[in-house]
Amino acid sequence: MNFKRPLILISNDDGYQSVGIRTLASFLSDFAEVVICAPEGARSGYSCAFSASDELRLTQRNNIPNCEVWSCSGTPVDCVKIAFEQILKGHRPDLVLGGINHGDNLSLIHI
């Protein structure tokens, strides 16, 4: 990682392969170091959940050019926590982003 540019950590609840995260990362990688740690697949509705007892898998991916991409078997919260503890190893990101979301963010009040 080249820390002469801003460091941005991205996660989401739609997974590391989602169109939204790829679009956001591709745009930001022109002027920042981008690290992605997102779930292996869609975890909609799990944004505030975390894994208390499950063993988590962390896998490095290469699906987005000019970005360091990791997938995690856990929730979005697990992804950000693991990114801080294992991937960034003490380096503090300048910005942490979530998204771009696929679909609407609706709660029970809207259903």
Give residue spans per PLM region.
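Glycine/small-residue-rich loop that forms an oxyanion/phosphate-binding "nest" at active or ligand-binding sites
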Residues: 78, 93-95, 99-104
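Short beta-strand segments
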Residues: 11, 37-39, 98-101
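Short, glycine-rich nucleotide/cofactor-binding loops
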Residues: 10-17, 105
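A short glycine/serine-rich beta->alpha loop
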Residues: 66-69, 102-107
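Conserved small/polar residues in nucleotide/adenosyl-binding loops
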Residues: 109-111
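A cross-family phosphate/adenosyl-ligand binding-site feature
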Residues: 2-4, 8, 19-92
